[in-house]
Amino acid sequence: MNDILKIGKYELNSRLIVGSGKYKDFQTTKEATLASGSELITVAIRRVNITNPNEENLLDYFKDTNVKFLPNSAGCFTAEEAITTFRLMREATGIDLIKLEVIGDAQKTLYPDVIETIKACEILKKDGFTIMAYTSDDPIIAKRLEDAGADAIMPLAAPIGSGLGIQNKYNIAFIRDAVKVPVIVDAGIGCASDASIAMELGADAVLANSAIACAQNPIQMAEAMKYAVIAGRLGYKAGRIPKKPYATASSPIDGLIQF
């Protein structure tokens, strides 16, 4: 299926993005990522060793693959922190495709601070970054982020790592209608069916981390996510039948034997 996902100047064949946290080791991270078919893995900048060549480095495990790294600003709580983090990262690596995260509540929900996110987005866009912005499932905020220069909107389905699945299907659909840039459902995915539902709602892609890394069999779950995203995308493009309150016969009544 030739169905390219375009994010700014970047093109991806897979509509599944994966995370790198919570795995037992880097080798499992690599094997699960390859099983998922994903071409993009997000990594917290503060967790990646880019200065000490003598320490184990996740980046080294993917040198022989086509998987690209998507640096994120997890751990940043202000626009200024995120901006500084990404500028230093680009200077060290040359990577300009980023996942912008500015957290507002670090204790319970890990919900984003959308005001600080918008501020950071405006400045980073002027700096030439291609921005994928993590945000709430508010369609108004999604539009504001698009106006601020976001190349993709990443609304949460539920709190990060909760596995609750999509808590507000209507808002995800509203966001899809509100913006023209890709919508990538991020956070809260718990199983393959969650990913498929997100795609059926019109999301352009899904990001999954905990659902894969914390599964009993991460590699098998990664493969399940791969096919769930494909199935959901195909179903969305095919167009579902309308919901009706009553039955509609699937077989014609013409030619029935008359008693």
From Swiss-Prot:
Source species, domain of life: Bacteria
Gene name of the record: thiG
An annotated GO BP: thiamine diphosphate biosynthetic process
Matching Pfam families: ThiG
EC annotation from Swiss-Prot or TrEMBL: 2.8.1.10
Binding site for 1-deoxy-D-xylulose 5-phosphate: 161, 187-188, 209-219
InterPro entries in the record: Aldolase_TIM, Thiazole_synthase_ThiG, ThiG
Oligomeric form and interacting partners: Homotetramer. Forms heterodimers with either ThiH or ThiS.
Catalytic activities: [ThiS sulfur-carrier protein]-C-terminal-Gly-aminoethanethioate + 2-iminoacetate + 1-deoxy-D-xylulose 5-phosphate = [ThiS sulfur-carrier protein]-C-terminal Gly-Gly + 2-[(2R,5Z)-2-carboxy-4-methylthiazol-5(2H)-ylidene]ethyl phosphate + 2 H2O + H(+)
Database matches in CDD domains: ThiG
Active site: residue positions: 99 (schiff-base intermediate with dxp)
Pathway where it operates: Cofactor biosynthesis; thiamine diphosphate biosynthesis
Protein species of origin: Aliarcobacter butzleri (strain RM4018) (Arcobacter butzleri)
Keywords: Cytoplasm, Schiff base, Thiamine biosynthesis, Transferase
Organism classification: Bacteria, Pseudomonadati, Campylobacterota, Epsilonproteobacteria, Campylobacterales
Tagged with keyword RNA-binding: no
GO molecular function, one term: thiazole synthase activity
Protein name: Thiazole synthase
